[in-house]
């Protein structure tokens, strides 16, 4: 039985992934909360992979203090790298990092198309995206034959009970008839 450890035990992605993994009895899923420093005292050994979804998101990137920015770098970058170093030292084989599409910068203007491929260069437009880029760089330096690093860059994460921008968009979609002649089902 392979053991997987999810960091960010109470996060939307972490709890959703944990529920999804219940379909696979050959995997044992453990979770750990990263809010306090107690995770540093927990053993990662015996886990095949760590899915690192702990992090900060949903900031108003246009109006934050330097203190808030520092906290984002401490959590999204420094803690991710520290967690990966601990995992590698304790024999974990794979570290899966939840990054963000924010590493690519702003979306295309309305009416324009922007296609992102594996060759698209990162170009973060704000501190949140940059905190993820810096984490990715530090994590990839740890990758070797025995310790694989996987970077996931999802677009907006949404679903029942999700936070962030999705509930706002959902509310607008219900109240503003943007496409009144189209029945969206």
Identify the meaning behind each predicted range.
Residues 123-150:
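Active-site Tyr-X1-5-Lys
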Residues 3-24:
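N-terminal Rossmann NAD(P)H-binding glycine-rich loop of SDR-like oxidoreductase domains
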Residues 73-77, 114, 124-133, 156-159, ...:
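Short-chain dehydrogenase/reductase
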Residues 142-151, 155-185:
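NAD(P)-dependent short-chain dehydrogenase/reductase
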Residues 81-127, 150:
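Conserved Rossmann-fold NAD(P)-dependent oxidoreductase catalytic core, especially the SDR/UDP-sugar
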Residues 30-38:
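Rossmann-fold cofactor-recognition segment
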Residues 37-90, 104-106:
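NAD(P)H-binding glycine-rich loop region in Rossmannoid oxidoreductase-like domains
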Residues 7, 50-54, 95-101, 152-154:
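SDR active-site strand-loop-helix element
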